[in-house]
Amino acid sequence: MKLTTVLVVALLVLAACQFTVTDNSGDDPENPSLRSAGENQNPDSTKTITAWATRDMTNMRRGLNRPSKRCLAGSARCEFHKPSTCCSGHCIFWWCA
C-alpha cells in the first residue's frame, strides 16, 4: 500500500511538471522571465524561421498563397492530427498546449 501511494504521488508530480513546462514553453514576449536564462531571446531565431518556412512551403503545395495565421496560440482549438498548427507544436485533446 505504501509503495502504491509513493508511485501515485510521483506520477502526479511528474504530470504536473510536464504541464507546467508545456504551458511555459510558448514564446511570450510580454513575460520573458518565463524563459530560461540560457535560451535565445531573439524571437526571429533560426528554429522559428525554419518552422515558418516549412509551414509556408506546405501551404504553397496545397495551393494556399498565404497562411491566415502563422500558428495557433495556447488554449486554441487545433486539429489533433496536425499539431504543427499550434505555436508550441503540441495539440492535446484538440487544444493547443
Curated annotation (Swiss-Prot):
Region annotated Disordered sits at 22-46
**Residues excised as propeptide:** 23-68
Taken from the UniProt record, the cysteine pairs bridged by disulfide bonds within this chain are 71-87, 78-91, 86-96
What keywords is this UniProt entry annotated with?
Cleavage on pair of basic residues, Disulfide bond, Ion channel impairing toxin, Knottin, Neurotoxin, Secreted, Signal, Toxin
Where's it found, cell-wise? Secreted
Task: Output a single Gene Ontology CC term carried by this record.
Answer: extracellular region
Q: Does the keyword field hold Secreted?
A: yes
A GO MF annotation of the entry reads: toxin activity
What tissues harbor this protein?
A: Expressed by the venom duct.
Signal peptide limits: 1-22
Principal place where this protein is found?
secreted
Which family, according to UniProt? Belongs to the conotoxin O1 superfamily.
Q: What does the record's free text say on domains?
A: The presence of a 'disulfide through disulfide knot' structurally defines this protein as a knottin.
Q: What does this protein do?
A: Probable neurotoxin with unknown target. Possibly targets ion channels.
> What is this protein's name?
Conotoxin Cal6.1b
Origin organism is Californiconus californicus
